[in-house]
Amino acid sequence: MEFSEWYSDILEKAEIYDVRYPIKGCGVYLPYGFKIRRYTFEIIRNLLDESGHDEALFPMLIPEDLLAKEAEHIKGFEDEVYWVTHGGKTQLDVKLALRPTSETPIYYMMKLWVKVHTDLPIKIYQIVNTFRYETKHTRPLIRLREIMTFKEAHTAHSTKEEAENQVKEAISIYKKFFDTLGIPYLISKRPEWDKFPGAEYTMAFDTIFPDGRTMQIATVHNLGQNFSKTFEIIFETPTGDKDYAYQTCYGISDRVIASIIAIHGDEKGLILPPIVAPIQVVIVPLIFKGKEDIVMEKAKEIYEKLKGKFRVHIDDRDIRPGRKFNDWEIKGVPLRIEVGPKDIENKKITLFRRDTMEKFQVDETQLMEVVEKTLNNIMENIKNRAWEKFENFITILEDINPDEIKNILSEKRGVILVPFKEEIYNEELEEKVEATILGETEYKGNKYIAIAKTY
C-alpha cells in the first residue's frame, strides 16, 4: 500500500479525523484524534509557559485595511484569503478577512501597549484556527483550508540582539518539542525567495515522510523592524530616544499530528508516543466460561492500580479477543495487558508492546515498575527508529550534478545535501534540479544546500 493511501486509511480506521465534511479542506477531529491533539499541544504550551511566554487570544476577523497595511506581507498570500462581505443581508463597508495568520491584528494591539523600553519584551502566543483558500490538492492535517490548530507566538524586543536571542530560544523550544515526540528534523535557513513575507529571514524545521517527501513542521521568523515600522510600535529608549521594536514570530500547526501518525506508524496502524497516547495501557480480559468474574475482578484490580499514574482503559466489549487486539494495534496504544485465568493462577501478567509486537510476562508485584520502564523504553525505541529512517533518507553529494540529483529524488527521494556555494544558491538551481531548495543547513558540522521534493 502506498503511503498516501495508508495515511488516509489510518485516519479513518484509527478514528482520528473525518474528512467527509461538505467543504473541501475542512474536516472533523474525532474524540480519539482530538485527545492526541490535546496532549501534543499541552507539551508546547508547557514549554512556552516555562520560557516566559503568556497565552492570549485575538479576534478571528481582520479588517481589510489592517490586513493590507503590510504590503509585502499580504502579497505572500492575498489569493488565499477568505473574506466576510456581509452581515446578514447588509453589505459591509469594510471587508473582514478570516485570519490567515495574526501578525497584523496582534501588531496593531502591540502599538497600543508599547510606550517605553520597560514595556518590553512582550512574548505572547495563541493556539487558534486559521483559514487559507488552498487551491492546491488538500490533504487532511497537512494542507487544509481551515487549519484547526495553529500555534503562533509573537514577540517584541528593545534591541536587535534580544530578537536574535529570541530566535535561538524559539529554535531550542521546538527542538525540545520534536525530541519529546520522537520526530526527526532538519533545520535550515530558508532562501530569500522563500522566506516569510516581511521577515528579515526564516528558519524552518523539515521532517521526512515515509514516501521520501519533506514536510515543513515549524518556522521561526526574525521580523527585524519591518512590521514595527509599518504599525508604529515605537518605544522610548533608556536614553530618551525613540526606536522601533524588534520582532519575531514562530509557529506550528496540525502538521505535527500528521507527522506523529506518518513517522511512527507501520503497516498495522498507529504507533503512538506514550506521552500523547489517549490510552497508554489497554487491559484486555480473556474471558473463559465459568471464569468470567475472576478475570474481570483481576482486570479491575490492575486498572485501579495503574489509573493514578497512567491513562488506562479496560476493553470489556463483548467481542473476540483477536478483534480487540487488532483494534488497539490500529489505534497505536503503546502497551496492552492481557488478563486470563492461567495468568491469575500463576500470579503473572502478560504484556504486549505495540512498537516491537513482542509479548512478555512479569510478576504481579513488579507491574507498576515494569509498565513505567516499558513505556519509557517504547518512547526511546520509536525515537531512535525514526531518526535512523530519517538519516537513511539523506544523501550527501560532493558537487552539484542536476541529473544525478533528479535521479536520486525520483528513485529514493529524501533530502540531498550539496556543499554550500553562494554562486549556485539561487532559484535557477531549483529549476535545474526540478525540486525545492529548503535552504542553508548545517549537517554534522558542514554547511550544505538542502534540496528535496516537498509536500
Swiss-Prot record:
It is an enzyme of class 6 (ligase). Inhibited by high concentrations of prolinamide. GO terms for molecular function: ATP binding; proline-tRNA ligase activity. ATP binds at residues 132, 134, 216, 219, 253, 255. Its EC number is 6.1.1.15. Keywords: Aminoacyl-tRNA synthetase, ATP-binding, Cytoplasm, Ligase, Nucleotide-binding, Protein biosynthesis. Pfam families: HGTP_anticodon (PF03129), ProRS-C_2 (PF09181), tRNA-synt_2b (PF00587). Residues 329-359 are annotated as: Interaction with tRNA. The keyword Aminoacyl-tRNA synthetase applies. L-proline binds at residues 101, 103, 132, 221. InterPro entries: aa-tRNA-synt_IIb (IPR002314), aa-tRNA-synth_II (IPR006195), aa-tRNA-synth_II/BPL/LPL (IPR045864), Anticodon-bd (IPR004154), Anticodon-bd_dom_sf (IPR036621), Pro-tRNA-ligase_IIa (IPR002316), Pro-tRNA-ligase_IIa_arc-type (IPR004499), Pro-tRNA_synth_II (IPR017449). One of its GO terms (biological process) is prolyl-tRNA aminoacylation. Catalyzes the attachment of proline to tRNA(Pro) in a two-step reaction: proline is first activated by ATP to form Pro-AMP and then transferred to the acceptor end of tRNA(Pro). Can inadvertently accommodate and process non-cognate amino acids such as cysteine and alanine. Belongs to the class-II aminoacyl-tRNA synthetase family. ProS type 3 subfamily. Consists of three domains: the N-terminal catalytic domain, the anticodon-binding domain and the C-terminal extension. Homodimer. The dimer is functionally asymmetric: only one of the two active sites at a time is able to form prolyl-adenylate, and only one tRNA molecule binds per dimer. NCBIfam families: proS_fam_I. This is Proline--tRNA ligase.
